Design a protein with these regions (language model features):
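Conserved beta-to-alpha transition
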Residues: 82-84, 88-94
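Solvent-exposed, non-membrane alpha-helical residues enriched in polar/charged side chains
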Residues: 52, 92-95, 155, 179
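Short, charged/small-residue-rich alpha-helical element at the C-terminal edge
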Residues: 99-185
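ABC-family P-loop ATPase nucleotide-binding domain
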Residues: 184-193
């Protein structure tokens, strides 16, 4: 491939070439913007392995990504919303702050259930994942850790739409953290305006 022009390379090959060019001088700090865009899953794993090797060798990496599964690979995260820092910490710290606020809803008609939940006070986001819904609320669990009050409100809203459903608390993931941080930040901005 020595004579191949960069413009004729695949997305993954271009990304590997860009990384090689970026590290050839042994930088102490490396900024990577969406480093694995247009890269297949296997190449993505290889790419991240190279990044960890660089980190082990002492290079500080700053990675921007909109892919939460990539963000989970990082040691520390900072979530920006319109240029403002709205959350930061380790993946475990960030997801831990959302304990008791995420639910999985299983319903016969997930789209109808999603519409029923859209206007429930305190619901920050509803996303369909497969045949289930992932619901993020702005309300934390009760002091005893119970989420039954929130779960019951969600179930009641869906039942009111004539849709039987099962609602269960779920562990938060980084996508939930991102949605909570950016929606909460927007609400603050809208109130200030």
């Amino acid at each position: 491939r020595q004579k191949q022009l960069a413009g004729t390379m695949s997305g993954g090959q271009k990304q590997r070439l860009a990384l090689a060019c970026a590290v050839i001088h042994g930088p102490e700090l490396l900024f990577l913007d969406e480093p694995t865009s247009a890269v297949d899953p296997e190449s993505r794993r290889d790419f991240w392995e190279r990044l960890f090797e660089l980190a082990d060798a002492g290079t500080t990496l700053l990675v921007s990504t909109h892919l939460m599964d990539e963000a989970e690979r990082c040691h520390r995260l900072a979530i920006l919303d319109h240029g403002a820092l709205v959350a930061d910490g380790t993946p475990a710290e960030l997801t831990g702050r959302l304990a008791g606020r995420t639910f999985v809803v299983e319903a016969d008609d997930p789209r109808r259930a999603q519409r029923a939940l859209a206007d429930v006070p305190g619901v920050l986001g509803v996303a369909q994942v497969g045949n289930a819904l992932r619901v993020l609320t702005g309300e934390a669990a009760a002091q005893d850790g119970s989420t039954s009050g929130v779960a019951q409100r969600l179930q009641d809203a869906i039942a009111k739409a004539g849709q039987p459903a099962r609602v269960a608390a779920a562990a938060a993931n980084l996508e939930d953290v991102f949605v909570a941080a950016t929606r909460t930040g927007r609400a603050r901005t809208e109130r200030a305006a």
